[in-house]
Amino acid sequence: MGKGDALTPKQIANKIKAKGLQRLRWYCQLCEKQCRDENGFKCHISSESHMRQMEVFSNKSSFIVSQYSKEFEEDFLRIMSRQFINSRVPANQVYAEYIKDRHHIHMNATEWTSLTEFVKYLGKTSKCEVEETPKGWFIRYINRDPEYVMRKVSEEKKEKAELNEEERQRLQIEKQIKELNKNKIEQDEIKPTELSKEDLEKMSLLELNIKSTTNTTTTTTNTTTTTTNKNIFDKLKTNDNNSSNNNYNDQTNPKPYAKKMSAIEEIMFKEKEKERQQKEKLEFEKQQQQQQQQQQQQQQQQQQQQQQQQQQQQQQQQQQQQLNSNNNNNEEKPWIIKDIVIKIIDKELANGKYFKQKGYIVSVENEFLAKVKLLDSGDILKIDQTFLETVIPQIGSTVIIVNGKYRGKEATIKNVNFDDFNAKLYIKDNDITITLPYESFSKQY
């Protein structure tokens, strides 16, 4: 058959296949294989490799589903922590970013049947802040990085210390203003004074003069009365002038005319002085106590800061020791051997073209570099062992041990422990059965 014309079903199907836009129902999660059409998917379902994977799944269905769920959750949270770390975003937007990877774990393979259930799960486990709105579910990532948490705690403590210092300064300024206003009011107050003996004598003299003038007016003639009245007024004027002069002298020079205090006044004056001294003493003691409290608070703050610094230094030292120990323990050792089947795990190699593809090692170039020939396409690649992983065949198959004392020996798989990620191997040459982890043996080509 020739090529289909433009806009025909065949041409449209070819374009879709060329773009890599295949349907989800034609994708096999167990085998991680995407089929192009329904016929190819049926052929894959009836294949031997798929049936073998289905047998493994039937034995450990819950374990495999939990593994897929764990990988799905980790990848989803990794996108949240890198692209949306401090923002509130729709859950659909994050999921759209997640499915851009062609080799992502599909949600149908997990324990969650929908994105809503997965979002609710994140909210219940306190891994994200979840909010349901008319526009859909919104989520915010909760950053639990130790360095980020410590930085936030230190910033909050610093803000509290600054607020306490500002509040203390404000209260001290208000107290000083109140004391100044109180002293000013006391100075402005005009207190009443008692009448002195001299004032009483002056008042009696005025009364006598007035009485004498009234007597003279009754006995004398009209003319004499006028003259006497004039004299009386003159006397009153002179008395007024004298009293005004005396008042002026009292105001300008109060000390020469100061009155001696009586015994009762002296006692009251002494009591007031004692009260004033006691108040001053109490205020002085309060100020000293406040200063001591401030000094103690400052010392406590300094001690707390020193303790925090010491704790941070200890944590940094422990982290450095852990890193050093991990580096010492994780020193990479060569494990690649000729004629073993391996799987490529490098997502960036040829833009993910060879990701999860199997091949066998044709030759070992050096301790860490191998020449690999792919089983499906026949392509030959040179690739480092860090981008390869071992392949675990079914029970009864022959494998080659790649690590440890029996490196290079052939063995037969007797049993596989999926929970502990290891298997029991029978070495015919030594006639022994040993248990090794998955990464210590691989399928023989």
From Swiss-Prot:
Instruction: Give the region (Disordered) as residue ranges.
Output: 215-256
Q: Where is the signal peptide?
A: none
A GO molecular function held by the record: RNA binding
One GO BP: DNA damage response
Sequence intervals crossing the membrane: none
Q: What GO terms fall under cellular component here? A: nucleus
- Biased composition, class Low complexity, residue ranges: 215-229, 239-253
- C2H2-type zinc finger positions in the chain? 26-50
Q: InterPro entries from the xrefs? A: C2H2-Znf_KIN17, DNA/RNA-bd_Kin17_WH-like_dom, KIN17-like, KIN17_WH-like_sf, KN17_SH3, KOW_KIN17, Rib_uL2_dom2, Znf_C2H2_sf
Tell me its family: Belongs to the KIN17 family.
Could you tell me what this protein is called? KIN17-like protein
Q: Which organism is it from?
A: Dictyostelium discoideum
Lineage from the top down? Eukaryota, Amoebozoa, Evosea, Eumycetozoa, Dictyostelia
